């Protein structure tokens, strides 16, 4: 439906090319989009500008339009509240700074058996224990779950199956990154190009041992960034 609307407007903006890509996660990530649309590959540690590209999402473009053409600053955004644990899933136009618990209340409240509330999506979102946290400019979704979709184990053991490597869109080695992240080995993490990880969550999702690979990478990223900045 969105594609039809865009194509119907194409005659008014002939200098804009519209491309429809297959739905395949994480196709929407900037490096994957650039590779799919231009066949240009960004080298490890580089940014899109290094291959002459800039990527903006729909919300950013809309905010730029309102600011430049209408003189309206970014004070609100669209937030989706969904999941089995929310009474009335829906979309809201929300003022930045609105507490999560206010939105959840307007959406009918949480189920008594709610186990987790996530800011963001199921693959890249962050669990929120404090629902007084505010909506920020990057908040696009609040996901309310009845059970832990990741099924994390208490003492997970790597089986060396290699599935996490096979699904990584950045061609990294999550199993080794996890090992060195646990012992905060900055040298090896740098060698493995940890900073190129986009935290898409594919490795954690496919892991048969339910190892929290992305969680470990996020923690290690802070350690490595501190070492790089020295």
Predicted features along the sequence, with ranges:
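Short alpha-helical segments in extracytoplasmic peptidoglycan/chitin-binding modules
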Residues: 97, 102-104, 117, 168, ...
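Ferredoxin-type iron-sulfur electron-transfer modules in oxidoreductases and energy-metabolism complexes
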Residues: 140-155, 165, 169-230
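Active-site gating/interface segments in enzymes
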Residues: 26-28, 32-41, 108-159
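Hydrophobic alpha-helical positions that pack around
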Residues: 2-100, 106-113, 121
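Alpha-helical scaffold segments in soluble metabolic enzymes
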Residues: 5-8, 63, 67, 102-106, ...
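Generic beta-strand/beta-sheet core signal
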Residues: 21, 82-84, 95, 118-120, ...
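Iron-sulfur-cluster electron-transfer modules
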Residues: 1-36, 160, 194-195, 199-204, ...
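Conserved active-site and cofactor/substrate-binding residues in soluble primary-metabolism enzymes
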Residues: 1-4, 55-63, 76, 87, ...
